[in-house]
Amino acid sequence: EGFMSLGYSGGKLFILAFDHRGSFQTKMFGIEGSPDPSQTETIADAKRLIYEGMELAVERGANPAATGVLVDEQFGSKVPERAKSKGLKLAMPVEKSGENEFFFEYGDDFGHHIEKFDPDFSKVLVRYNPEGDAAMNERQLGRLRTLSEWLHERNRKFLFELLVPAEPGQLEAVGGDSDRYDAELRPELMRGAIEAIQNAGVEADIWKIEGVDRKEAQSQVPL
């Protein structure tokens, strides 16, 4: 039953992503470590301003049924209710910010936080290179399978953002050129990553993947 309900049949989705946390506080505000209440409010105010830009877009004609926001609980906890009241789609992150390995932001309590805000999509950002650290990949797959099963048992949608960062040897093989890595190696590595993730029992409803430069490379990505 859960498998049959996989996917998203609502047509196009245009989602404004502002769920950045660690990078947002350091690069935008120069705040290191855990922000104090005053700093947290400053960051939260910036998130509200970003959200208000989306409300303005809807007022000017953007279709709310195809438009959404991806916002975090830490700094954007006031946004979900406002977004829902406007008929916007809501996506919220599950992963811990700023980690190379996927961890739950709220540990074993992840389900409570999802149910509290009731997003249309629960999103993960995962760095997975099929030729990377095998033990880390296995640990990530275990956590992702836990999340995938939890979501689909409750008929909740799973949004999977996949990044495939270059391993040192892969980058060396293309002369240290990141553009060549993206064009020549990443499409096949993305295919391998998605295959490994799905073979591990992790089923996403929506895949958000990095673009590929050549049309023939698109056929390598099994989606």
Enumerate the language-model features and the residues they cover.
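Alpha/beta catalytic barrel-like cores
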Residues: 1-136, 203
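Conserved, mostly hydrophobic/aromatic
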Residues: 16, 161, 207
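Gly/Ser/Thr-rich loops at beta-strand to alpha-helix junctions
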Residues: 22, 164-166
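Alpha/beta enzyme core
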Residues: 27-30, 48-61, 106-122, 129-130, ...
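Hydrophobic beta-strand scaffold residues
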Residues: 90, 158-160
